[in-house]
């Protein structure tokens, strides 16, 4: 047995132990870092404090949004809470106006004192009712002569009329009303349209 044989035996043994063939270089396994190294207690506290601050800021933002929404709802309730009642009262105003319109002008001029007092009483009641409505934010729409607006007017018919621009309200059938900036009841109107030109 020579020294070369000893060296050969030693290298063969080392190769077998390493699981590789003789003459191949030996490769060691790389060190792999753990995926989630353990946090130190101070890092955990900092992370927990940041999460708590984030939750607190979100809660404060939600509370502020809730406060603003509640204020809007309260303001709307104050402004529009009487809408249903006001709509019912408008029928009374319409009936008072119909009663006044039912008396012809000639009958008013030649009326006896009893009829004159009745007409004045109905007019006074109508004015009083409109004042009460205005006091509560309900305003009358004066539609006659205005440009037709589908947001506040409801067209019932068209009237051929070249004396005004097409799309102008020429007749009001039923008065419209607003409550705040909302339409309580649209005005029922007749709208002008251009008269057809005669055929030549």
UniProtKB/Swiss-Prot annotation:
GO biological process, one term: protein folding
GO CC entries: cytoplasm
Domain of life: Bacteria
GO molecular function: adenyl-nucleotide exchange factor activity; protein homodimerization activity; protein-folding chaperone binding; unfolded protein binding
InterPro entries per record: GrpE (IPR000740), GrpE_coiled_coil (IPR013805), GrpE_head (IPR009012)
Entry-linked NCBIfam families: PRK14140.1, PRK14141.1
Protein name: Protein GrpE
Source organism: Afipia carboxidovorans (strain ATCC 49405 / DSM 1227 / KCTC 32145 / OM5)
Organismal lineage: Bacteria, Pseudomonadati, Pseudomonadota, Alphaproteobacteria, Hyphomicrobiales
């Amino acid at each position: 047995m020579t020294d070369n044989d000893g060296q050969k035996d030693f290298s063969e043994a080392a190769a077998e132990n390493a699981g590789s063939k003789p003459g191949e270089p030996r490769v060691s396994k790389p060190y792999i870092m753990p995926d989630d190294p353990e946090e130190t207690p101070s890092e955990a506290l900092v992370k927990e404090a940041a999460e708590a601050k984030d939750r607190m800021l979100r809660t404060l933002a939600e509370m502020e949004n809730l406060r603003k929404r509640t204020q809007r709802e309260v303001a709307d309730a104050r402004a529009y809470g009487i809408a249903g009642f006001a709509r019912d009262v408008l029928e009374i105003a319409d009936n008072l106006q119909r009663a006044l319109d039912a008396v012809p002008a000639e009958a008013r001029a030649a009326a006896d004192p009893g009829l004159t007092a009745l007409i004045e009483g109905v007019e006074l009641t109508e004015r009083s009712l409109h004042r009460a409505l205005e006091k509560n934010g309900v305003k009358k729409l004066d539609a006659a002569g205005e440009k037709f607006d589908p947001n506040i007017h409801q067209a019932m018919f068209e009237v051929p009329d070249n004396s005004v621009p097409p799309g102008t309200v020429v007749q009001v059938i039923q008065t419209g009303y607003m409550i705040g900036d909302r339409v309580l009841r649209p005005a029922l109107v007749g709208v002008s349209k251009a008269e057809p030109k005669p055929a030549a």
